[in-house]
Regions:
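Short, well-structured segments within or immediately adjacent to enzyme catalytic domains
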Residues: 1-242
């Protein structure tokens, strides 16, 4: 979270771009690429080292390892172009994703959901918050947060920003969460003894232990413990505008 705080301090309090895609266009993604199972950047950290395409890397001391949870045990042959790494077994490039209710988008993406243009200083729309893709708008009906000062409710100590994402749901770096209908769209991780790491807007981090003692599954939730976990996460993702 220190890197995020430094970024917002340099960018008029705006969160970095967090669009609902894996674009690698310079200047339009806090963390570019598709790092999920089978994704082209699953074992290729190169894009994470490009400060124009992964806008937090300069605030992380150019250490791409900080995008990955050490408990994520995926390993495979390197997929990038660095001659020193070609043919070597490397860990997965990324585990972390950002709350889709947090961050900014550019006017081009806001208009098309497919291309990027203009300055990314619009709040994200939270495209999955209603359970129907692209139905939610900024603060209509669910809150989204384009600046650090926007938080509340949820309060900064309750609003999660980064999460360990399960590799089965990992694709782009924006974590999709619905606030209605008790279902998992993307999957929070279980890397820490069936617990998941979260970083919150106030700067603190914690490992939340799930009541449902197994990996999350995409789709409708039927187990009461799993629903309790979903309720906890929704309460820390967004809030309905009153």
């Amino acid at each position: 979270m220190l890197a995020l705080n430094l970024y917002t301090g340099d960018n008029n309090d705006f969160y970095p771009p967090n669009p609902d895609d894996a674009n690698t266009d310079p200047g339009y993604n806090w963390c570019s690429g598709n790092a999920g199972i089978g994704g082209p950047q699953e074992f290729d950290p190169d894009v994470l080292l490009d400060p124009t395409r992964s806008l937090l890397i300069g605030y992380l001391g150019n250490n791409a390892k900080l995008f990955r949870c050490p408990a994520d045990m995926r390993q495979e042959k390197y997929q990038g172009t660095d001659p020193a790494l070609i043919g070597h077994i490397v860990p997965a490039a990324r585990t972390f994703s950002m709350n889709q209710a947090v961050g900014t988008i550019d006017p081009g993406f806001a208009a098309t959901y497919s291309s990027h243009s203009g300055v990314p200083n619009l709040p994200v729309t939270g495209p999955w918050l209603t359970g129907v893709w692209q139905q939610n708008l900024h603060d209509d009906p669910w809150r989204t947060f384009g600046k650090m000062s926007d938080a509340g409710p949820p309060s900064p100590s309750d609003l999660w920003v980064f999460v360990d994402e399960d590799a089965r749901g990992l694709n782009d770096a924006a974590f999709a969460m619905t606030m209605v209908g008790a279902q998992w769209v993307d999957l929070p991780g279980t890397y820490h003894n069936i617990g998941c790491g979260f970083a919150f807007a106030d700067g603190h981090s914690e490992t939340h232990r799930w009541l449902y003692r197994s990996e999350k599954q995409k789709g409708d939730i039927t187990d009461p413990n799993d629903e309790a976990d979903w309720n906890w996460m929704t309460a820390h993702t967004s809030a309905k505008v009153q």
